[in-house]
């Protein structure tokens, strides 16, 4: 009898604590985004920014997903504030929440207020084409063919840093 009471007490306590402290697994919801949903092409890179937007770089443009809607950005030859090319290599968000997009024809910075892009140019007005990007405390380094460029947070300037004359067509891809 004592054993039966002990078992009954244990079962009762377990039942009470189960109701008080229920075991809950986290519920994760996801939505698969595909070409049917308007995704421009095969995904090359993905970035989640500080505001929670998911940026998707493809071979046929850039897309921004807010959890409900997919917005596409493509190069428009007649619009100087569009992305410089549709082939997106890499994206990165810096400590000042600038989003940098490296494309086949230049580097662009996303302008949140106007929902468009500014394209980085060198001193002769040509687009800067970078193969790699690296965040630093004072700014952003961009590695290009035979060159390294630096964007400074302090004075918001973009300047040429260092040539590489070691080999022809040397790319600074590992900054």
PLM features: what roles do these ranges have?
Residues 1-175:
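Carboxylate-rich, polar loop motifs that coordinate divalent cations or form catalytic acidic clusters
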């Amino acid at each position: 009898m004592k054993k039966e009471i002990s078992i009954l007490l244990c079962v009762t306590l377990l039942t009470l604590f189960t109701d008080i402290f229920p075991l809950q697994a986290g519920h994760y919801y996801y939505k698969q985004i595909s070409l049917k949903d308007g995704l421009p092409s095969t995904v090359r890179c993905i970035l989640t920014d500080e505001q929670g937007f998911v940026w998707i770089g493809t071979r046929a443009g850039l897309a921004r997903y807010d959890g409900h809607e997919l917005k596409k950005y493509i190069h428009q030859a007649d619009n100087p504030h569009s992305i410089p090319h549709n082939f997106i290599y890499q994206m990165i968000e810096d400590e000042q929440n600038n989003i940098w997009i490296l494309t086949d024809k230049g580097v662009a910075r996303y302008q949140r207020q106007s929902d468009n892009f500014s394209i980085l140019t060198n001193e002769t007005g040509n687009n800067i084409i970078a193969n790699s990007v690296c965040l630093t405390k004072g700014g952003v380094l961009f590695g290009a063919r035979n060159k390294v460029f630096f964007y400074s947070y302090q004075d918001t300037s973009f300047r040429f840093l260092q040539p590489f004359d070691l080999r022809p067509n040397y790319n600074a891809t590992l900054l």
